[in-house]
Amino acid sequence: MTGSISTSWLLSSPSNSNSASSSESYSFIATLKPVRYYPFQSLTPNRISSRSPLPSIQIRAGIRELRERIDSVKNTQKITEAMRLVAAARVRRAQDAVIKGRPFTETLVEILYSINQSAQLEDIDFPLSIVRPVKRVALVVVTGDKGLCGGFNNAVTKKATLRVQELKQRGIDCVVISVGKKGNAYFSRRDEFDVDKCIEGGGVFPTTKEAQVIADDVFSLFVSEEVDKVELVYTKFVSLVKSDPVIHTLLPLSMKGESCDVKGECVDAIEDEMFRLTSKDGKLAVERTKLEVEKPEISPLMQFEQDPVQILDAMMPLYLNSQILRALQESLASELASRMNAMSNATDNAVELKKNLTMAYNRARQAKITGELLEIVAGAEALRES
């Protein structure tokens, strides 16, 4: 033979070996151009031409492994796309629930503030509106029951953790009421949190029954003076692409606008706000009112025949239930929006990965076919020249 047949000829240029002394007998191997193998193959050239496009992801695998990975990515893409569609359908219902509940909640808060202001002017004390020096705070932390929603649960638990640390630095004890399976798992396995109760969501959408369970626990803690202040930590729904964890003061219902500790220092969170949901052009919007703003005046058209204390006794349970239900609804809407965005990103990543894997698979398959053809032709040429 004029030259030995081996795999090295695929990667190297023709050699000037003395074994082919005759200039007339050309080896087929000497006329072949080097075959370029890409990084996903086991045989890698020292230098690859800059004109040869490389895949965006360097994948090293055989043809069978690539085919299995492509099938796996396709199945994952179907799952993420289905979850995105489900979240998109549910987030619309959750958003509608928040918007439809806004007029009732807003009007109820205005009436309660007006009645409470009237009671304070008459030196009438109501248990849920008494501002005491803050020695202990109850945090109602609302999280989700499921994962696969980006950083939704992590953001609200981090917000609650920072709030607990801030209160402890001021020498104020803190007790946590966790709502949601993810929050329950987070707080229960950490010894630095004093967990009063862990509550799990019961249905697909929040109901007044679920809110009433939380309201009863909050009411008993505040009235028995086990805590001096109650705060809601939940995720505020702003839009389908934005949601922020916030802190909202639930009790006491006071016109003074702030709560102080035994030293007279304000213990309200810096971002503590009263949020009012509004709808503009059929879309959900948020109107913010700082704690320092003037509270609504008593309407001259609003007259009550009953005693203010009797009215507050009858309406405060409704107030607690409505505020907690609103927090649950906003948290659910934020969770669904976050899951929809996360699944959308996962679907896009799956499409891109499938594209890269398919390209690598086609190149590996083409290289294998080309190599087999070259071996057949080279073997035939060697037999002809022998």
UniProtKB/Swiss-Prot annotation:
Q: What GO biological process term is on the record, naming one?
A: proton motive force-driven ATP synthesis
Catalytic residues? Answer: C149
Membrane topology per record: Peripheral membrane protein
Induction is noted as: By light.
Q: Which PROSITE patterns match?
A: ATPASE_GAMMA (PS00153)
Q: Where in the cell is it found?
A: Plastid, Chloroplast thylakoid membrane
- Where does the protein principally reside? plastid
Question: What residue range does the UniProt record give for the transit peptide?
Answer: 1-60
The record's annotation in CDD domains points to: F1-ATPase_gamma
> What's the protein here called?
ATP synthase gamma chain 2, chloroplastic
For this protein's source organism, the top of the classification is: Eukaryota, Viridiplantae, Streptophyta, Embryophyta, Tracheophyta
